[in-house]
């Protein structure tokens, strides 16, 4: 048995090959993440007598090139959580941290856990694309939030509270009514310098041009509030330029978010479990694809507890002797992106309260018992995942 430990970094990796009882087959050496170097590594591993298993840490996205190529070469590859490697066999007072030492440590881990190593599954291109899109979606959502807060901060100095006038959601092209309104009426003087009738006519024409619903009472309310507001920045070309730039940045981020949302739904609809997932309560065309992106292929989980552990919503255990802790925090060792999506699903269930849904009934029961927010939300996420696993696996097997 040959254990190949690979310490992965960006663009290159350190490789060590060992056998039981500390026998060194190959001293640590460096390879680049290029076709020629990877092919040379495959030839070296195949030339070593006996069964070989490759272990590496799944660090960011760096490991995927090696894991994919080595798996394609019909080699046994196992990608391990870095924390498991870090906590393994720390029996020395010396603190040695180098790529060579890490590669040897990973090889020793492979030998020790030989029977328990799980083989890396090459994710099909569709799921890989969906997961990449979801990560980009999360990135641009954060960017959009930052741009939104930036615009509100500037508008508070020219037209305080304008962002609260409308609560309509973003359109498919990313546009929002309050942003379009602030782009046109960027200063409070843009409204109150007109007469009431002139503003109503102007606002009505604006709604017609932008294809928004017009309400005369809303126009009168906006005009009345504008009369009482006190701006800080003057109504001049410089202030207008600052606001226009902030609006353009927000619209750009919002357009990207909505286009990704649409593309993710189109991509997810090609997966076999799409109809089952979309039929679940709390899941729509936005959260459904996000769930499928983060969970991936359900068949790789051997049982329900495996998928809850993957998400990090499984209950912890703290027992020693006669002591047994009754309430233990969840592990939170799994995918933080999946936990975030699950919490959003729970939030939708709480807001829509579908009485016939078992997950909502469970959430409502825990809330009635006086459980803290994070306790009942995490418990609901756990139950939702178990139901998700059961329904999807049953559908795929049929």
PLM feature segments, named:
Residues 1-398:
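A detector of single, family-specific signature residues
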């Amino acid at each position: 048995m040959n254990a190949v430990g690979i310490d992965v970094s960006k663009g290159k990796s350190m490789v060590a090959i060992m056998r039981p009882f500390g026998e060194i087959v190959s001293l640590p050496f460096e390879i680049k993440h290029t076709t020629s170097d990877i092919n040379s590594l495959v030839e070296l591993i195949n030339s070593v007598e006996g069964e070989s298993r490759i272990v590496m840490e799944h660090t960011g996205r760096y490991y995927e090139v090696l894991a994919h190529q080595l798996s394609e070469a019909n080699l046994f590859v196992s990608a391990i959580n870095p924390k498991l490697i870090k906590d393994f066999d720390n029996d020395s007072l010396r603190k040695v941290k180098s790529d060579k030492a890490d590669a040897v440590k990973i090889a020793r881990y492979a030998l020790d856990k030989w029977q328990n190593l799980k083989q890396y599954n090459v994710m099909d291109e569709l799921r890989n694309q969906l997961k990449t899109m979801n990560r980009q979606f999360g990135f641009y959502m954060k960017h959009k939030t930052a741009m939104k807060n930036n615009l509100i901060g500037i508008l508070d100095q020219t037209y305080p509270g304008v962002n609260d006038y409308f609560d309509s959601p973003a359109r498919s092209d990313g546009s929002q009514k309050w942003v379009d309104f602030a782009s046109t009426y960027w200063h409070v003087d843009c409204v109150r310098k007109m007469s009431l009738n002139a503003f109503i006519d102007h606002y009505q024409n604006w709604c017609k041009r932008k294809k928004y619903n017009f309400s005369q009472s809303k126009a009168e309310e906006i005009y009345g509030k504008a009369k009482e507001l006190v701006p800080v920045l003057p109504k001049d070309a410089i202030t207008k330029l600052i606001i226009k730039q902030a609006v353009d940045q927000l619209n750009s981020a919002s357009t990207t978010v909505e286009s990704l949302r649409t593309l993710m739904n189109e991509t997810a609809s090609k997966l076999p479990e799409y109809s089952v997932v979309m039929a679940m309560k709390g899941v729509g065309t936005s959260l459904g694809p996000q769930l499928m992106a983060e969970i991936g292929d359900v068949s790789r989980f051997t049982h329900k507890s495996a998928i809850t552990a993957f998400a990090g919503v499984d209950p912890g255990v703290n027992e020693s002797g006669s002591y047994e802790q009754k309430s233990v925090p969840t592990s939170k060792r799994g995918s933080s992106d999946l936990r975030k999506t699950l919490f959003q699903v729970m939030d939708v269930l709480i807001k829509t309260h579908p009485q016939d849904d078992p997950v909502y009934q469970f959430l409502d029961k825990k809330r009635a018992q006086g459980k803290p927010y994070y306790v009942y939300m995490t418990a609901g996420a756990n139950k939702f995942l178990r139901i998700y696993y059961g329904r999807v696996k049953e559908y795929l097997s049929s």
